[in-house]
């Protein structure tokens, strides 16, 4: 919805929407809570492998909280995948394991193209990715609990939409 624009001090840019994007927390809250304290955000997207913490996480988010089921969420009532609108952008949220993301991005890329979305958000690999192919953003925030990329720092992503409705994504790391 429409909300007051928050302008960054000393900057021309005004922020419309900021989403904290996380995945693969695997039942652990400590790094997620640190990321939530560190960032200002209007909503959260969790790309799966929540492992029973969905109600607790939702209770800590003051705004929309979109979550999907991962391959380790056996007894979850979360949806396997969802499509939502974030400002003017169509987002497809999935854990990614059903699209072969461990082998590469081609499967998830093809699915996102077939759905006509602007951004696809997924997890599963525990390795962060934020790349734009044409008009499509492909985003994996990595894992806050069990990072697997070089250096193995816990990671998440921030999705920002400015007052010109421009979308940007940044991968961030906890030390």
Task: Describe each model-derived feature in a short phrase.
Residues 1-15:
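Single conserved hydrophobic/aromatic residue that forms the stacking wall/gate
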Residues 11, 16-64, 73-80, 152-155, ...:
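N-terminal active-site segment of His-dependent metallophosphoesterases
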Residues 26-30, 50-55, 72-77, 99-104, ...:
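Active-site environment of divalent metal-dependent phosphoester hydrolases
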Residues 58-66, 131-145, 150:
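Short acidic, glycine/proline-enriched helix-loop-strand junctions
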